[in-house]
Amino acid sequence: MSSIPNINWNDPNNGKSNTSRQSQPQPQLPSNVSPPNSRAVPTSGSIGGPQYGSSQFSNEYSRNPNTIGGPPFPLQSNQRGYMPNTGYPVQQTAQQRSGDKLQQVHSQQQQQQQQPLYQQYPPQSVGYLAGDVYNPQHQEYVQMNQLPNQHYNLQQRQQAQGQQLKSQLNEQNAMMSASTQQYPVQDFTNPYPNAQNPAEQQQQQQPLRTQSQQWDGYQSQPLYSAAGNTIPSSIQQQIPPQNLSPSEQQQVKQQQPSPPEQGTKKKPGRKPKLRKLSESSSETPQVPKTASSSSSSPTAVNSGKPITKRSRMGCLTCRQRKKRCCETRPRCTECTRLRLNCTWPKPGTEHKNKPKDQKDDENTIEHAEFGRIKVLRGIVEYRSK
């Protein structure tokens, strides 16, 4: 039996459906609504031209913004959404408006975070206004007015500082004069007022000292005799000894501590240590602490050179065989163990190079049959009887 298709009497096509539409069931949409991807079909039998069923769709989209066929992007406040293939604007709901406002707030916050904080310190006063840029004559006038004021302020500060320094120096000079009463105080602010040499200044200071002696009434006695030698040693050390008389120099030398006492306080440097070592080495030559020290000491005394680890000399046999020698005389332990001839160099010739003839004589032996022949002593060893 063939199934009778359900005829929808509200269909604008008057029930004329194709077989392809029956095989593919589609969701039933409300009447007078076109599918989202299809164009609006005009209704037949209508008066006043074709009518598009988009007014109802726009109303439904305003109620439910998630309907199929809506704009795929959020609408801004200054934009108007239009339905696809229609000329009707889409009405935005309150939810979309609130979402747009939130997006604007977020974008403003991000811009504020990205902007660096340039005004970290309070704004400082500027010497010119913005309008002065367009009036260079006025700007030059302002600058000319500011320069003397700045110079005047600097002069005032320098004068105030100079007065403070002078007052402090005057107080110090008063204290020094009260303690010494005879020693002329040096001017620390301007020691060489007329750019004179120190020698000329010293010559000028000499009459001042003579005047102070005459004023105190102690011409015959030397300087500082009236005070009873109550002047501190620091001031006495500052006095140049060239300007003093011979009697004054002797008195200053007696009051100053002796140089050997200062030498004992200081730590000894390297130079005194080296001197002590050289003196001790010249008095007693260094002898290595070995078993052969007693045997090797006479050679050192005869040669006049101190024996060290580098300058030790063994027997000639050990030197030829390139072995370590214990330097025991008359026979070393190595030669006695191997029963070799332990020969020692002549006194005074330990550190001298051997002549060529002597080397040839040492390397040759008298043979009974062959006579005088050369021998390689490093390889062939002849045992003594």
Curated annotation (Swiss-Prot):
DNA-binding interval(s): 315-342
Annotated protein name in UniProt: Zinc cluster transcription factor CZF1
Gene that encodes it: CZF1
UniProt KW DNA-binding keyword: yes
Region annotated Disordered, chain positions: 1-117, 154-216, 233-308, 345-364
Biased composition (Low complexity): 20-38, 102-117, 154-169, 201-214, 233-256
Entry annotated with the keyword ATP-binding: no
Annotated keywords: DNA-binding, Metal-binding, Nucleus, Transcription, Transcription regulation, Virulence, Zinc
SMART domains the record matches: GAL4 (SM00066)
Positions with biased composition (Basic residues): 265-275
Biased composition (Basic and acidic residues): 348-364
Polar residues composition-biased segments: 1-19, 52-67, 88-97, 170-200, 279-291
Organism the protein comes from: Candida albicans (strain SC5314 / ATCC MYA-2876) (Yeast)
Quaternary data: Interacts with EFG1.
Chief place where the protein resides: nucleus
Induction trigger: Regulated in response to carbon source, temperature, growth phase, and physical environment. Expression is up-regulated by rapamycine, and thus is under the regulation of the TOR pathway. Binds its own promoter and is also under the control of EFG1.
Record's function text: Transcriptional regulator of the switch between 2 heritable states, the white and opaque states. These 2 cell types differ in many characteristics, including cell structure, mating competence, and virulence. Each state is heritable for many generations, and switching between states occurs stochastically, at low frequency. Contributes to formation of the opaque state, but is not necessary for heritability of the opaque state. Plays a role in cell adhesion and pseudohyphal growth.
Pfam families according to UniProt: Zn_clus
Cell compartments where the protein resides: Nucleus
Outcome when changing R321A: Impairs DNA-binding
GO CC terms in record: nucleus
GO biological process, one term: positive regulation of cell-substrate adhesion
CDD domains associated with the record: GAL4
GO MF assignments: DNA binding; DNA-binding transcription factor activity, RNA polymerase II-specific; zinc ion binding
